């Protein structure tokens, strides 16, 4: 199968929203595409079960007929960064579980779209055996897509994210600008500068409240790499 890892330039940048649109586009093109997230904090309670909000959103938008709990390895209730939530709940993240869960999902789908937590610098476990989000991306051998905001400040955060990925030997296959307005001169210029400064193509621009990606499922598949 194939896979891609979606990260963002920060929290609340629209990473989950864009991930859902990617999956929706693939599934509407009859691609058997699935979702995976290693760790999610800030889950909400529904009756007596914890619901991983991001995964629930993605499955509902993309029409993925799987219960969201099955797509996330670690679900934490506290709305703090994952390593702190794990400490509070005394349930540290284990890389072997992440690997086996991911590969289990990869056997059920032809394409897996994995999603990070927060930005690219995200501690998942900070103790005597620390795990960073970049360790997960490297261990799963996935290339990344960076979701960035189209507006003011995006050049700095996007170029930094791409440079950090490169420094950690992570391949960036593309950048997606969210809340993009083609009539906005700065948005158009940001796109140009980001491509120039990173050498990475902006593969899609997503307008505010877009329900459909403007790029083809073929292009999205082309951005995925074979899962090893």
Predicted features along the sequence, with ranges:
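Conserved glycine(s) of the Walker
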Residues: 13-14
């Amino acid at each position: 199968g194939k896979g891609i890892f979606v990260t963002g330039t920060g929290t609340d940048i629209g990473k989950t929203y864009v991930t859902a649109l990617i999956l929706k586009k693939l599934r509407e093109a009859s691609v058997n595409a699935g979702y995976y997230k290693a760790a999610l904090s800030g889950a909400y309670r529904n009756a007596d079960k914890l619901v991983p909000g991001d995964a629930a959103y993605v499955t509902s938008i993309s029409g993925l007929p799987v219960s969201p709990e099955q797509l996330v390895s670690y679900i934490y209730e506290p709305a703090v960064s994952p390593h702190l939530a794990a400490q509070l709940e005394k349930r540290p993240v284990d890389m072997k579980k992440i690997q086996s869960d991911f590969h289990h999902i990869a056997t059920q789908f032809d394409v897996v779209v994995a999603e990070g937590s927060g930005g690219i610098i995200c501690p998942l476990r900070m103790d005597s055996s620390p795990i960073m989000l970049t360790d997960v991306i490297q261990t799963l051998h996935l290339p990344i897509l960076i979701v960035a905001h189209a507006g003011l400040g995006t050049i700095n955060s996007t170029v930094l994210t791409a440079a950090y990925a490169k420094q950690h030997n992570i391949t960036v296959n593309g950048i997606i600008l969210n809340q993009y307005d083609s009539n906005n001169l700065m948005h158009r210029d940001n796109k140009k500068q980001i491509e120039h400064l990173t050498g990475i193509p902006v593969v899609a621009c997503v307008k505010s409240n877009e329900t459909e990606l403007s790029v083809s499922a073929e292009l999205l598949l082309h951005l995925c790499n074979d899962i090893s």
